[in-house]
Amino acid sequence: MITDKTECNNPLFGRILTAMVTPFTENGDVDYELAIKLSNYLFENGSDGIVLCGTTGESPTLSWAEQHELFIAVKGSLDASCKVIVGTGSNCTSEAVEATKKAYDSGADGALVVVPYYNKPPQEGLYKHFSSIAKSAKDLPLMLYNIPGRTGCNLLPDTVKKLMDFSNILSIKAASGRIEEVTELRAICGSELSVYSGDDSLLLPMLSVGAVGVVSVASHLVGLQLKEMIYSFQSGKVSNALAIHEKLQPLFKALFMTTNPIPIKAALELSGWDVGNPRSPLSPLTNDMKKQLSFILKSL
């Protein structure tokens, strides 16, 4: 596995990583066959990689056994050039360590490790948590995941800089909702750290201040358009990138009209993918919201 940080200018994981939903059957079981079909569709339609068992994948309501089986099914079906990153984070350090070890042993291309949620550790605690994971992960590339709106805890750039002493800490998903987060990370950590936008609506603004790509929800539906936006920006066709950004804003907003992944699961259903309802305690999208979403999808 590649861990040379000089390669981060050409992001190890690619530019567009889809945070894939976990399909469920009518009975609420994981639909592994549909997960295989969906992941291959995503790869063929703009995604450079697939992120499994993250927020969008409903990791809080998946057992570790289900998460492992899902990874094995998807990874085994995809072309080797498609990176598969698996969520291994937990607010229990020992659990995160064991899950990350298992991801390494199973052949994952990387692990997404979220900031511990609920117990709100201080920065020194965060450093020790991620250090333990990095030490146990051998050369498995790690993507830190900062999403303070869900975790109640913010991973500061100074702490990220310290963590970069570990050769396998290569990237971060920045989902604070603050464009300044990218600027701060770049200023303190330099270009060796690949920063991914964690918000589709902030992808273009974050690209302008140094982000390399996105961990996307909208790419389930508009992966090719997102890819065109990124490469338009990179090639200096900023007006075209801006036009795509503006066209997709209603979709970006609609996909967060309520808690993710409720809207994207409904959007996929409206697009012909029967991925099932979210597991409890999440609930299906209301009929009124579904009508709004359907209108926006038809306008794409």
Curated annotation (Swiss-Prot):
Keywords: Amino-acid biosynthesis, Cytoplasm, Diaminopimelate biosynthesis, Lyase, Lysine biosynthesis, Schiff base. The active site is at Y145, K173. Its EC number is 4.3.3.7. Gene3D superfamilies: Aldolase class I (3.20.20.70). Its main location: cytoplasm. PROSITE patterns: DHDPS_1 (PS00665), DHDPS_2 (PS00666). The record marks T55, Y118 as: Part of a proton relay during catalysis. GO terms for molecular function: 4-hydroxy-tetrahydrodipicolinate synthase activity. One of its GO terms (biological process) is diaminopimelate biosynthetic process. Pyruvate binds at T56, V215. Catalyzes the condensation of (S)-aspartate-beta-semialdehyde [(S)-ASA] and pyruvate to 4-hydroxy-tetrahydrodipicolinate (HTPA). Homotetramer; dimer of dimers. Belongs to the DapA family. This is 4-hydroxy-tetrahydrodipicolinate synthase. It comes from Prochlorococcus marinus (strain MIT 9301). The lineage of its organism: Bacteria, Bacillati, Cyanobacteriota, Cyanophyceae, Synechococcales. The gene is dapA.
